[in-house]
């Protein structure tokens, strides 16, 4: 078990979240309706899924669903880019889309350039560029 095939985010409003990711940030999906039961986005190598938060909690355990909260859960999602300037470009897109800027783009101790934002449900995203980031022929990050 050494591959992540799908990342699922439980969201409070499918319509609002689909609009944010599909229409504002440009994620590709076959979701035609704005309030489906589930929505998958195509990202290279991994599916990205939105699912209603309350239904996701019940799917995990109908008898004892996890408590839904607003706190930081110790996980971030990341989008790594191939040019330093792209971090600023992505953050302008996020800002215009209504994302919450948590940390403005800045140089970081390891020689890179990064920033953080949260989406409409409070999930943390890092956008980062590194001088030593290398990508394969499919655009996948190699370390």
Predicted regions and their residues:
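N-terminal beta-strand motif that seeds the catalytic metal site of vicinal oxygen chelate
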Residues: 1-18, 74-79, 131-143
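Vicinal oxygen chelate
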Residues: 4-12, 39-42, 62-143
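Core segments of cupin and vicinal oxygen chelate
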Residues: 8-57
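Short linear motifs in intrinsically disordered
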Residues: 26-32, 82, 105-107
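Short coil/turn motifs at secondary-structure junctions
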Residues: 55, 82, 130-132
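A short, acidic/glycine-rich surface segment
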Residues: 57-64, 134-137
């Amino acid at each position: 078990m050494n591959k992540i095939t799908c990342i699922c985010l439980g969201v409070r409003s499918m319509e609002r979240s689909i609009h944010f990711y599909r229409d504002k940030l440009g994620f590709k999906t076959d979701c035609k309706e704005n309030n489906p039961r589930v929505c998958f986005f195509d990202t290279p190598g991994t599916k990205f899924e939105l699912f209603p938060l309350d239904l996701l909690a019940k799917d995990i355990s109908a008898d004892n669903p996890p408590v839904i909260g607003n706190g930081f859960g110790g996980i971030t999602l990341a989008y790594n880019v191939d040019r330093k300037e792209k971090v600023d470009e992505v953050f302008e897109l996020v800002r215009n889309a209504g994302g919450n800027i948590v940390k403005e783009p800045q140089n970081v101790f390891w020689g890179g350039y990064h920033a953080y934002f949260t989406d409409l449900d409070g999930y943390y995203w890092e956008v980062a560029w590194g001088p030593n980031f290398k990508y394969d022929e499919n655009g996948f990050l190699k370390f």
